[in-house]
Amino acid sequence: MANMDIDEFKEFGKAAIDFVADYLVNIRDRDVLPSVEPGYLHDLLPNEIPEKGDDWKTIMEEFKRFIVPGLTHWQSPHFHAFYPSQTSYSSIVGETLAAGLGVVGFSWICSPVCTELEVIMMNWIGQLLNLPRCFLNCDEGNGGGVIQGSASESIFIAVLVAREQAVRRLKNEHPELTEAEIRGRLVAYTSDQSNSAVEKSGILGAIKMRLLPADDDCVLRGRTLKKAVEEDKANGLFPVIMVATLGTTGTCAYDNLEEIGPYCNDNKLWLHVDAAYAGASFCLPEYAWIKKGLEMADSLNFNLHKWLFVNFDCCAMWFKDAAMITEAFSVDRIYLQHKFQGMSKAPDYRHWQIQLGRRFRSLKVWITLKTMGAEKIRELIRFHISLAQKFEQYVRADPRFEVTSSTLALVCFRLKGEDTYSKQLLDNIVKRKKIYMIPATYQGKFILRFMIAGIDPQAEDIDYAWNEVKSQTDLLLGVDDNGNNVCSKKLIKEEIFEKDNPVGKITESLGGLVLANEKAQ
């Protein structure tokens, strides 16, 4: 096969599995961020493809020398930045098997098990998450689920489906308008706390996306949506879709579906719910309050690769009425047709997505869920939440800090006083590369996000992270071992300038940071 025979394949494959196993077991020994500069790889790899191939041992050696040093270690328990991109040993096996099978399952006939396993897995996941039954593929409803690549992809698809449904309806309601005129008046809504993918979906879908202001708790309320819709209707626009978020990117806030849902349903406004991260918590009865009002949504998405131990990419998406997406996306060429199409238990998923070809993602989902079981999944999610609560206790016990919000496995906090404190602290932590956090804003203030992530986070990892935060805070504020402030720098407020750093712009004086509890001399 190509330039590798079966024996070499087995040897290379075993070496690769051994590397991954050792890498994950010993990942705590590595700095979570790489020590490379932009363009480092251009100096290491040739500019052109080699004329003759190398043996796998040479390639594996170069992989270790050239590729691994450029990694940010997302599976490290010291990765506390973005929402996690988790994996598990069972998922890795499933991904490997799917790659070896090489299935392209855009229709049932292309590989029946690829389609049927996906239908079953989407019901398994929906039942695990205690979703309203109207979203499941069952005899008494029109619902159904599909695996997409990412939340971004799912949101974009929801916007496109809502757009096409609205255009069909509006052409009947407004025969005096051309289709082009109707499309030019479409408008969509989301919170200013939603993921950037929502705003991007408006750009790609050629729909004006209004970012509505959330309240002081970063929650979008029904009255805010109502006001915006009424303003737009008065200006001759046509509201199409509201994209709500359960678990915002910055602070994991939850839009109020109990207020938003009824208004959307009463005003022919498609309601899509992005629960990319927080959706995993639906499997826990104690967090059922998060999804109140979800039954009023027309579609929703949840990333298994964030918190259900399936590796990237794998996003579950459900529709209350699956016919809506097939009506919007169906393009049926003769070479794609087969005699079994149209069966509810064997959908042609090519009609449920943007691209034609699709991967056998349901295989890694099945292997992961069957290996772990629902009980173990719930246990691990609860454990991750307890780790975040442990970190929160550390923060609250230190009077220099304040917790701005804490929910699920995310803690948002800051140093009291001016934003300059927290900005410089985060800058110093990122430069050291021992743990990795990113910033957000909350009520106009700069905050630090501490996220539980990695393949196997433990209590000692929380101790390690807190010690890093505390020690860097001590250095920043000039605190000795007894907790006394020994900072004697002369602070010059008049000579302020801004400089670039890994977390944005920070304000500094030439004499050092201007501390909020001290007056500049």
From Swiss-Prot:
Residue list for modification N6-(pyridoxal phosphate)lysine: K306
Keywords from the named record: Catecholamine metabolism, Cuticle, Lyase, Pyridoxal phosphate
PROSITE patterns: DDC_GAD_HDC_YDC
Reactions that this protein is recorded to catalyse: L-dopa + O2 + H2O + H(+) = 3,4-dihydroxyphenylacetaldehyde + H2O2 + NH4(+) + CO2
Keyword Protein transport: no
GO CC terms in record: cytoplasm
Stated family: Belongs to the group II decarboxylase family.
Designated name of the protein: 3,4-dihydroxyphenylacetaldehyde synthase
